Structures are given as structure tokens and as C-alpha cells.
Regions:
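Non-heme Fe(II) oxygenase catalytic core, chiefly the N-lobe of the double-stranded beta-helix
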Residues: 2-230
Length: 230
């Protein structure tokens, strides 16, 4: 049993959980509550938490084995955590993670979840935005759904983290972020454009403009035209 509650934040995505202190050992009931809330609401928020790195990782362990994000230097002694930093003087510099994307789709086995801990945030602005690609799929016509279900997306990190990618330029790279461009970013990974969630059975679009390079057997230009239609 748990006394935790969740309040939906919008009709389709987002829920705020109250009644769980992530800095204390999390009970099986609380862990189940968090996992179910994530399935139901896609993204969940727990406010006023005070976590150190070990406690942060303990939350991640509720969902499975932790992984290191490639191409970005991690926190010392904690390879599963990296800091997203925007310095005051970087106001006009490219915003790390500031375009629409799904984390790590360039991996053969992408991470199940990402866990952001707001250690120091602005009093206003600086919003992180989320979208439900399950509801995006549901909103498509049946004809478009059938078309997309037959496609395979080719994903790569090259445009962001490659040797000639965004972060290879001194004019783009954030001084506060320690990004490591690499030839390994050029690797291309295939995922179905429409994926079915193994627990809920809901279908979702699995594409994003940041890492989906093109659709298999289509040009990038043809892919972009399909993106614009949706």
C-alpha cells in the first residue's frame, strides 16, 4: 500500500505525483505506483525532491539497468549521470537538447526512460516540453497509419555528435557542456517507425527530427516531406 497520489496535468500527457520521497528507500508499492503512473501519463513529475547522485541512480534502477549516455562526459564516479548546463553567457548559443527529440534512438537498444533532476532551474522560462507520440499516432488517418506501419526509420547521432556535427563547431558547442564528438556517432541503427508498447499494447510513432536520418529505401527529402505532413 502507498499513500501516493497523482494529478493529471493535461488530458493526454503528464502527471504530478505527491506522497513519495525519492531520497528515502522506495517501497515495492511506491515503485509499482511510479511505473504505472509513467505508463498512464507518459511523463511524471515529483516536486521538491532533494537527491544526491546515488539516490538519483536508485530511482533509475526501478526501471532496469542504468546506461551511460555516449558522446557526453559524465559526472565523475557516476558514468550514468551527466549534467545539462546552460551558463548565463551562453544565452545565444545552441541549446543542448533544445529541439524535439526522443533520447538515444540512435542506440540499438534505446533507454526505457530518462530521469531529469532539476538541481538549479530559472524562476521563469527554460521550459522542457514533452509530447505524446502515442496520441500523435492515434490522431493520424487510418491510411497514414497503414503507410507508416510499413516503414523503417534509420537513426544516427552523426548530425549532433559526429566529427562534423553540431557540437564539433566552436560556435555551437556550449561551454558548460562537455560534449565529445566521435566517429562512432556515424553508426546507423534501424527501428520501426511505429512501435507497440509491450506492456500497454498502444502504438506510437518512433521518429524524431534530431536522430531519424531517413526512412529505409527513401531519401532524406522524402522523409522530411512525410514529417511535415504529420
Amino acid at each position: 500500500m502507498t499513500n501516493a497520489t497523482i494529478m493529471p496535468l493535461t488530458p493526454v500527457i503528464g502527471g504530478e505525483i505527491e506522497g513519495i520521497d525519492l531520497a528515502t528507500p522506495i517501497s515495492d508499492a511506491e515503485a509499482s505506483f511510479i511505473r504505472q503512473a509513467l505508463l498512464d501519463h507518459h511523463v511524471v513529475f515529483l516536486r521538491n525532491q532533494a537527491l544526491d547522485h546515488e539516490q538519483h541512480k536508485a530511482v533509475g534502477n526501478l526501471f532496469g539497468e542504468l546506461v551511460k549516455v555516449p558522446f557526453v562526459e559524465s559526472v565523475p564516479c557516476h558514468p550514468e549521470i551527466f549534467e545539462i548546463i546552460k551558463l548565463p553567457e551562453e544565452r545565444d548559443v545552441y541549446n543542448f537538447g533544445g529541439n524535439w527529440h526522443t533520447d538515444m534512438t540512435y542506440m540499438q537498444e534505446p533507454a526505457l526512460v530518462s530521469i531529469l533532476y532539476g538541481a538549479e532551474v530559472p524562476t521563469s522560462g527554460g521550459d522542457t516540453m514533452f509530447a505524446s507520440l502515442e496520441d500523435s499516432y492515434d490522431a493520424l488517418s487510418s491510411g497514414m497509419q497503414q503507410l507508416l506501419e510499413g516503414l523503417t526509420g534509420v537513426h544516427t547521432a552523426d548530425r549532433s555528435y559526429g566529427k562534423a556535427g553540431k557540437f564539433a563547431s566552436d560556435t555551437i558547442a556550449d561551454e558548460g557542456m562537455d560534449v565529445r564528438p566521435s566517429e562512432d556517432a556515424a553508426k546507423q541503427i534501424e527501428h520501426p517507425v511505429v512501435r507497440t508498447h509491450p506492456e500497454t499494447g498502444r502504438k506510437a510513432l518512433y521518429v524524431n527530427p534530431n536522430f531519424t536520418f531517413h526512412f529505409k529505401d527513401m531519401s532524406e527529402d522524402e522523409k522530411n516531406k512525410l514529417f511535415k505532413q504529420n
